[in-house]
C-alpha cells in the first residue's frame, strides 16, 4: 500500500495517476475530504493536525508521500504546517513506512545563484522560514535512520488542471480568461519552472527507487530557462493569441498588498522575480536518464487543449 497525504492537490492527483499506472495496485488517498482519482483508490478521511488520525491513515503503508498544502496564509503556515509534518513523520515511523517529502524552494536564497541540492538555506520572510524549518526537520529524520526518507524539491510550478502558482495565476489564467498575460516584477530574468505532471512523475520515481532514499533531489526541469517575456510569447502562441503581455512592477504588487490579503501574502517572494531563477536538476537526470522532461511549448499546448 502506498499512501498520499494531502491528496486533493494537483501534485497529489498526478502522483496518484503515476503510482497507479507504474508502481502499485494499492493506493490510499488521505485528506480531510479525499476524492478518488481511480475507482480502486482507498479513501481515508483524516486531519493531519490530529496525531491519532494520521497514525490510523498511514497504518499498513509501505511508502508515504507528503504532498499536503495550505493556503498562502502566513499564520496557517506557522501554526499548522509543522504539526502536520510532525504527525506525518511519527505516523510513518509507527507504520515502518518509507517517507517521501515533496518540497519547494522557499528556503533558498532569493538571488541569481545556481541552486543545487547543496545550496545552504537562507530564507527570506516567514513562509520561507517555515519551509526551511520543515525541510530541516525532514533532514533530521533522514539522519536518524529509523525509516528511509527522501526529499524531492521543486521550483515554481506551471501546469494543467488546478495548478496553483504565481505563473499560472498571472500568465495562464489570464489567457484562459481572454486577458493579456501578466508577469511579476520583470520580464527579462531567466526562469526555471517545473511542469506539475513531471514533478509528480519524478516524486513517484524517487519513492520507488530504494537507492534514492537518504538524499535530497531537485526534481527535473527543462533546462531552456526562458525569460518571462519568452514564456509569455510561448503561452500566447499556444493559445492562438498575438504575443503581448504586461509587467506588474514590484511597487504595483506591493501596493496591491495594501488592499488584497492574497497579494500581501506573496510580497516576501517578490525578490526572487527580480533575479534569474536557476534551478539545477542534474542529479536526478543522471540517476534517471530515461525520464523525459516536458518542454515548455509542449506543456503550454497541453494546457490549451484542456481549456474550454
Locate each region found by the language model.
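Mid/C-terminal beta-alpha module of Rossmann-like enzyme folds, strongest
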Residues: 2, 202-265, 281, 292-308
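N-terminal Rossmann NAD(P)H-binding glycine-rich loop of SDR-like oxidoreductase domains
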Residues: 2-22
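SDR active-site strand-loop-helix element
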Residues: 5, 30, 67-68, 99-104, ...
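NAD(P)H-binding glycine-rich loop region in Rossmannoid oxidoreductase-like domains
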Residues: 35-95
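Conserved Rossmann-fold NAD(P)-dependent oxidoreductase catalytic core, especially the SDR/UDP-sugar
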Residues: 86-131
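Conserved beta-loop-beta element that borders a ligand/cofactor-binding pocket
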Residues: 104, 136-161
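Glycine-rich "substrate-gating" loop/helix at the edge of Rossmann-like oxidoreductase active sites
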Residues: 127, 155-165, 185-197, 221-223
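A conserved pocket-lining segment of Rossmann-fold NAD(P)-dependent short-chain dehydrogenase/reductase
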Residues: 173-194, 205, 211
Amino acid at each position: 500500500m502506498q499512501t498520499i497525504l494531502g491528496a486533493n492537490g494537483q501534485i497529489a492527483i498526478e502522483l496518484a495517476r503515476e503510482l497507479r499506472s507504474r508502481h502499485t495496485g494499492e493506493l490510499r488517498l488521505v485528506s480531510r475530504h479525499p476524492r478518488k482519482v481511480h475507482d480502486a483508490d482507498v479513501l481515508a478521511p483524516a486531519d493531519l493536525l490530529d496525531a491519532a488520525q494520521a497514525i490510523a491513515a498511514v497504518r499498513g503503508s509501505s511508502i508515504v508521500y507528503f504532498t499536503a498544502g495550505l493556503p498562502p496564509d502566513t499564520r496557517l503556515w506557522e501554526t499548522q504546517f509543522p504539526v502536520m509534518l510532525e504527525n506525518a513523520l511519527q505516523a510513518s515511523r509507527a507504520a515502518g513506512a518509507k517517507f517521501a517529502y515533496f518540497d519547494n524552494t522557499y528556503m533558498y536564497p532569493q538571488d541569481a545563484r545556481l541552486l543545487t541540492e547543496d545550496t545552504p538555506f537562507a530564507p527570506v520572510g516567514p513562509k520561507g522560514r517555515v519551509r526551511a524549518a520543515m525541510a530541516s526537520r525532514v533532514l533530521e529524520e533522514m539522519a536518524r535512520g529509523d525509516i528511509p526518507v527522501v526529499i524531492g524539491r521543486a521550483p515554481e510550478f506551471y501546469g494543467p488542471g488546478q495548478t496553483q502558482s504565481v505563473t499560472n495565476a498571472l500568465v495562464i489564467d489570464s489567457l484562459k480568461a481572454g486577458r493579456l498575460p501578466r508577469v511579476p516584477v520583470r520580464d527579462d530574468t531567466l526562469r526555471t519552472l517545473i511542469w506539475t505532471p513531471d514533478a509528480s512523475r519524478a516524486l513517484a520515481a524517487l519513492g520507488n527507487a530504494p537507492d534514492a532514499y537518504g538524499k535530497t533531489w531537485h526534481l527535473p526541469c527543462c533546462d531552456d530557462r526562458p525569460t518571462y517575456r519568452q514564456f509569455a510569447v510561448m503561452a500566447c502562441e499556444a493559445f492562438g493569441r498575438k504575443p503581448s503581455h504586461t509587467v506588474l512592477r514590484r511597487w504595483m504588487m506591493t501596493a496591491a498588498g495594501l488592499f488584497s490579503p492574497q497579494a500581501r501574502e506573496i510580497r516576501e517572494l517578490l525578490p526572487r522575480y527580480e533575479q534569474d531563477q536557476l534551478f539545477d536538476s542534474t542529479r536526478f537526470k543522471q540517476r534517471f536518464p530515461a525520464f523525459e522532461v516536458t518542454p515548455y511549448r509542449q506543456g503550454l499546448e497541453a494546457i490549451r487543449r484542456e481549456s474550454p
